[in-house]
Amino acid sequence: MINLDFRKKMADSWFSYLQTQICKEFENLEKGNVKFKKRIWKKQINKEGGGTSFLLTNGNIFEKVGVNKSTVSGKFKKNFRSKILGAKKDGKYWASGVSVVAHMKNPKIPAIHFNSRFIVTTKE
């Protein structure tokens, strides 16, 4: 079995790569007319993680697109632990993922939203 720390690094790298590729594709659809603006953030509570947000606004096709990647760790609140596999005893977690939200300029085309996550608790 692959070491858990290695799997975390692989997941974090994969989500960074995925974020970059998604941003490139949205910019390609906009034919280079608009570019994403990058913002780096840190988790305020316990300072255990952070992420990168990319925002594209006022394109020809897209009114607004957000492509966010985060990697955080901490402890689930006690009332939430029983709902998460492997978190019941101590509540520790590590998570990484990508979230995408896109709103088109054309009001007849629906918005999209999706995310993908890798969550680690004390139970593998």
What do the PLM-derived regions correspond to, one by one?
Residues 3-85:
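Gly/Pro-rich turn-and-neighbor structural signature
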Residues 67-124:
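Aromatic- and glycine-enriched beta-alpha-beta binding-site module
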